[in-house]
C-alpha cells in the first residue's frame, strides 16, 4: 500500500546507527514553514515549580509479566491487579485507609468486572470507602492512570493515590454474533410459547459464529502490525535492523534479569500452581534463527515478524504516588518526582506509531530541557520497526519541518541511554500495565546510575502518544 509518506519518508536522515546506508539523501534545514521554536536549554538543578506541589513516586511494583496462555491463563484480570496491589501494600506497608483514590488502566475489559480497579482494590483489602475507577487509553492506559493521579494530587483533591494497570490476554471476551445476541434478548422478552417458537424459527447456523475482539484499528481497519510494517518500509528500516534491535532488547533484558535490576517485580503465588518470580518472555536467540521466521502481517515481503514484535502478555502493575510533603511526613523516602507530561495524537493511518516522535520535543520544551539533559530513556517497544522509525523521524530536520511544524529535529536518543534493561519486546507488554513499568524502570535506573532526568514515551492505538519527565529524588 503506497501513500504519500512512503514516498517522502525515504528522504529522512541517516545519522541513526540503524539507518540504511543507501538511497537516502541529506536533509535541508531551509523550510519556510511557520514553525514551533526549537527546544532551548535551561540549566536547572530541579524541575520544582514555585507554588506547585511536588508529586513523588514512593514505590512501584509489578507481578511478573508472562506470555499469555501460561501460568495466569485460568485467572481473571482482577486477580492479577489484586496481586499487584497486594505486592505494593507489602513492600510499602502503607496503611490501607490512608489511600485516597485508586486508578487502574486496562484495554480489553472483562465484562464481569467492568471497573477492575474497584474490584481489585476490594480484593486486596483496601477500605470500601476508597473510591476507584478504571481508565482506558490503549497502550498508554496506565500512563493515563498515573497522570490522573498527579492531577488529583496537584489540585489538592488527594494526597495519596495508587495508580496501576492490568491486562489478561489469556482470556479475552469472545461474544456471540450480533444476530445471536439479538435473538437471545428477544427470547428473554417473549411472554408466550408462540412468540418464542416464532423467534426460534428465524435461527440460522451462522448465528453461532463467534465475534472475536477487534484486532484492527476501528478508524482505519488496519492491524497495528500491518501499520508497523508499512511504517518500517516508509522509513527504510530493514528486516536485519529490526531483528538486531529485537535481539538487543532480549539480551539486555536477560542481563538485567540475571543481575537483579528488575527489582520492581513482586512474586505472585498463583492459586493451585507454583509461585511466579520472573518474566518468562525473555528469549535471547540468534540473528540466524530470527531470520528464519516468515513475515507476520504483510506476506510474503513484510519485515515485521513474531521475533521483532512484542508478544501477547498477561500482567499487572501498581504504583504509590503521593505529595512530597505527605510522603515525608509518613517517613517514606521517595524514588522519584513525576514532572511534566504531555499527550499527543496524530494521523492514525500513516503515523499510528509515531507518538514518541511528537511527544518528546513537546515535553522537553515544557520542562525546559534538551535531549542532552536526559540520563535515561524508557520507550515502549511495540515493534522493532516502530522504535527505529521513531529514531529516524526524531533525527530528521525534514520530518520536523514538514510534518511537525518545527524548525529543527529533536534528535534521536543515544543507545547507551536507551532501554538498557530491555523493553516491551522482551519483558512483555500487558497493554494496560506497561506505562507503570516504564516509569519504574526510569526511576530505578536513575537511582542506580546517579542520573537526574529520565524521559518516558510511548505510542498507542488510535494514533496517540505520551511522554513524561521523571526526576530522580535526592539520595
UniProtKB/Swiss-Prot annotation:
Residues annotated as site: Increases nucleophilicity of active site Cys: 429
InterPro entries on file: Thiolase, Thiolase-like, Thiolase_acyl_enz_int_AS, Thiolase_AS, Thiolase_C, Thiolase_CS, Thiolase_N
Location relative to the cell: Mitochondrion; Mitochondrion inner membrane; Mitochondrion outer membrane; Endoplasmic reticulum
Enzyme kind, highest EC tier: transferase
Transit peptide region: 1-34
Gene Ontology BP term (one): fatty acid beta-oxidation
Pathway(s) per entry: Lipid metabolism; fatty acid beta-oxidation
GO cellular component, one term: nucleoplasm
Coiled coil start-end: none
Entries under PROSITE patterns matching the protein: THIOLASE_1 (PS00098), THIOLASE_2 (PS00737), THIOLASE_3 (PS00099)
Post-translational modification: Acetylation of Lys-202 is observed in liver mitochondria from fasted mice but not from fed mice.
Entry keyword annotation includes Mitochondrion: yes
Catalytic site positions: 139 (acyl-thioester intermediate), 459 (proton donor/acceptor)
Lineage top rank: taxon: Eukaryota
Positions bearing N6-succinyllysine: 53, 73, 189, 191, 273, 292, 294, 333
Intramembrane segments: 174-221
Residues with the N6-acetyllysine modification: 73, 189, 294, 299, 333, 349, 362
Quaternary context: Heterotetramer of 2 alpha/HADHA and 2 beta/HADHB subunits; forms the mitochondrial trifunctional enzyme. Also purified as higher order heterooligomers including a 4 alpha/HADHA and 4 beta/HADHB heterooligomer which physiological significance remains unclear. The mitochondrial trifunctional enzyme interacts with MTLN. Interacts with RSAD2/viperin.
Described purpose of this protein according to its UniProt entry: Mitochondrial trifunctional enzyme catalyzes the last three of the four reactions of the mitochondrial beta-oxidation pathway. The mitochondrial beta-oxidation pathway is the major energy-producing process in tissues and is performed through four consecutive reactions breaking down fatty acids into acetyl-CoA. Among the enzymes involved in this pathway, the trifunctional enzyme exhibits specificity for long-chain fatty acids.
Family label: Belongs to the thiolase-like superfamily. Thiolase family.
Name of the molecule in the record: Trifunctional enzyme subunit beta, mitochondrial
Species of the source: Mus musculus
Gene name as annotated: Hadhb
